[in-house]
Amino acid sequence: MKLGAWVAAQLPTTRTAVRTRLTRLVVSIVAGLLLYASFPPRNCWWAAVVALALLAWVLTHRATTPVGGLGYGLLFGLVFYVSLLPWIGELVGPGPWLALATTCALFPGIFGLFAVVVRLLPGWPIWFAVGWAAQEWLKSILPFGGFPWGSVAFGQAEGPLLPLVQLGGVALLSTGVALVGCGLTAIALEIEKWWRTGGQGDAPPAVVLPAACICLVLFAAIVVWPQVRHAGSGSGGEPTVTVAVVQGNVPRLGLDFNAQRRAVLDNHVEETLRLAADVHAGLAQQPQFVIWPENSSDIDPFVNPDAGQRISAAAEAIGAPILIGTLMDVPGRPRENPEWTNTAIVWNPGTGPADRHDKAIVQPFGEYLPMPWLFRHLSGYADRAGHFVPGNGTGVVRIAGVPVGVATCWEVIFDRAPRKSILGGAQLLTVPSNNATFNKTMSEQQLAFAKVRAVEHDRYVVVAGTTGISAVIAPDGGELIRTDFFQPAYLDSQVRLKTRLTPATRWGPILQWILVGAAAAVVLVAMRQNGWFPRPRRSEPKGENDDSDAPPGRSEASGPPALSESDDELIQPEQGGRHSSGFGRHRATSRSYMTTGQPAPPAPGNRPSQRVLVIIPTFNERENLPVIHRRLTQACPAVHVLVVDDSSPDGTGQLADELAQADPGRTHVMHRTAKNGLGAAYLAGFAWGLSREYSVLVEMDADGSHAPEQLQRLLDAVDAGADLAIGSRYVAGGTVRNWPWRRLVLSKTANTYSRLALGIGIHDITAGYRAYRREALEAIDLDGVDSKGYCFQIDLTWRTVSNGFVVTEVPITFTERELGVSKMSGSNIREALVKVARWGIEGRLSRSDHARARPDIARPGAGGSRVSRADVTE
């Protein structure tokens, strides 16, 4: 009966939770479809605003957790990219199409996680927009050089916000669209809250910020629009030239395009001859130069004389230079392993080849195969990838004396390619493209990207495709003339040669980095506000009833120290508030207790450490061991020494035995049969020392980098109450000597990465000079430690803090070894990157679960927060 009553009581809550989750799932799917609708062939620019508004609604919902934000963002991205990229699957099947869509969807997933973390900050629509721009930047560089296809800005070629791209490039346009969408959501949520309270009083003040943001975006677009609108008319002093585009077409679409090479070349020659005939008949204008598409001559004209003769005949017939697309062998490569460049080369009538541009951003899986040892086993199409290598240069060729920028095919989607051409002096942009392996949808989307570039850089853009769509685009983004898809045709049009540099051309990368930096900064601020970074806590003086043998601030009977009211900030929910991050600051069940700087003097009643064991792992340290042993026994005569030797081939183990014989009872040696890493050596030493009732166990390197003369600082800190005393290079008073700058940068980067990932306020978490109380080591599951290298130090520190023990950093002087060779390797770095990330995620998820179980610490969202301090007991 009791079970039945409990189930009946839970049913309404369960139904509500399921209904709420299903609603968010459906809204995420609809949002992904709407974002797709903003791109060609739909061209519903407004759908992007609605899509991001709906996604913002999902991510600001109080029931959406950080993991939920990741999931909803991933679902949104998957629906969007699966809908946007089906043209990939038409020729290679669903596998590569879905794999690419899934990879791209990871980035909106990252945005979803970011958004849930920062949503409680004042002005969250701004941070959402900044975060969206940052994830688009990340997708433009990762993986394998990035894939910017699908950036929100590229769906705005027909929209009223397009002028923003001239101010700050694609990044600013995407940010503006996201800001409008998120601002509308914020306004709607505040109006809803105001309405639910009966509409009493004035309009909600929280709508002012998002409304102002929307107005600012629209105002910026309106200010720039007149200049964009009249860009095609020129200033009156700009020269004009006539440009012709030849679209020769291919016999059939598909991946066997290369088998049609001669037919494709002949098609472009014949279409150029038709253009020449029309010029001579007065039906077309005489062009100053002609643009052929990418791969219009996939027969190298320098190797095949017949191909060169055909191109020369076309150039002489039209009486103008032709920019042809071809491939060229990389000199010096063996015949069985050739490489090529994807080249656009100027072919002058009478004199032949002249200036050239080698494609600088080659396409993975199409023009080259990354990680062939893996992908050859995953797809039968992998071996059809080319062997192209990237070129270099300014991205500018001179045709008939005109500097023309070349962005070959998919280079147009990367900000850096057209910008490099313009900064290199290009007065006109051209996009030679080969879309014979895809379909009309892909060509329409690429054409939209070219329109955005025309406005961004205030240049005419000439698009030439083997199968279409070819077009001439004005600087206002409008099409002057275009061809249909999959038909032979030519275009001729007058264009103006422009030299003005737009703000986006000049400062676009700077704005991009500002947005990325702002996103990184705001997420750190949000993580701190959400309680992810513990604050340094100082020990409290012991009361007269405290156990005299317990460290300060801690009773052996009561466990970890209680925290005062000022230690944590708890955010109280507003009445009627919709949002909750699930990240309110709370008291974790295990607590760390940390201090930094000079060690405190021993508290009254604390007995100094009596039995201290210094563990020194060795491998090929024969030159260093006698020196460090002598310095240690002179500096701290009372400590015992354990040398753990990993079968050093240089005789270090035998030398250690001699030192032990000369110092009986104080120096000991452990011989291990194999070199299993630094971590395994220390674990063996810990087990040896714990079994012999040592009260303090110290880690020390044999190479002299850890000064034995400074060991007393660590022991004083332990006697003062620390469970783990770390000899720190990076707290006040700590220094590093004779270290190569690369190692110093690596060390500081590793510490910063670990500190941020784990949320631990320890400055030198990778330090290897440290002293442990035996109680701390006994509480740690040492059998579960499998880390090696310096990751071992991070692992033990993380376990010590997670178990609620006191960690203290004391300053030391670290000196680089003078003798022997460092054991640092790339595998140590890879291990740390992976494991620290995993520990950080696991720790934050456990904190998140704890916070969600505590509704009294939930935090409100869009309209700001009221902060109060309170102590929470478990």
Swiss-Prot record:
PROSITE patterns: CN_HYDROLASE. Gene3D superfamilies: Carbon-nitrogen hydrolase, Spore Coat Polysaccharide Biosynthesis Protein SpsA, Chain A. Its EC number is 2.3.1.269, 2.4.1.-, 2.4.1.83. It catalyses: a di-trans,poly-cis-dolichyl phosphate + GDP-alpha-D-mannose = a di-trans,poly-cis-dolichyl beta-D-mannosyl phosphate + GDP. Pfam families: CN_hydrolase, Glycos_transf_2, LNT_N. It is a multi-pass membrane protein. GO terms for molecular function: dolichyl-phosphate beta-D-mannosyltransferase activity; hydrolase activity; N-acyltransferase activity. Pathway: Protein modification; lipoprotein biosynthesis (N-acyl transfer). Its main location: membrane. One of its GO terms (cellular component) is plasma membrane. In a number of other Mycobacteria, including M.avis, M.leprae and M.smegmatis, these domains are encoded by 2 separate adjacent genes. Consists of 2 domains; the N-terminus (residues 1-593) probably has the N-acyltransferase activity while the C-terminus (residues 594-874) has polyprenol monophosphomannose (PPM) synthase activity. The whole protein has higher PPM synthase than the second domain alone when expressed in M.smegmatis, suggesting the N-acyltransferase domain plays a stimulating role in PPM synthesis. Catalyzes the phospholipid dependent N-acylation of the N-terminal cysteine of apolipoprotein, the last step in lipoprotein maturation. Transfers mannose from GDP-mannose to lipid acceptors (works best on C20-C95 lipid monophosphate substrates in which the lipid can be modified, tested with the C-terminal domain expressed in M.smegmatis) to form polyprenol monophosphomannose (PPM). PMM is an alkai-stable sugar donor which adds mannose-phosphate residues to triacylated-phosphatidyl-myo-inositol mannosides (PIM2), eventually leading to generation of the cell wall glycolipid lipoglycan modulins lipoarabinomannan (LAM) and lipomannan (LM). This is Bifunctional apolipoprotein N-acyltransferase/polyprenol monophosphomannose synthase.
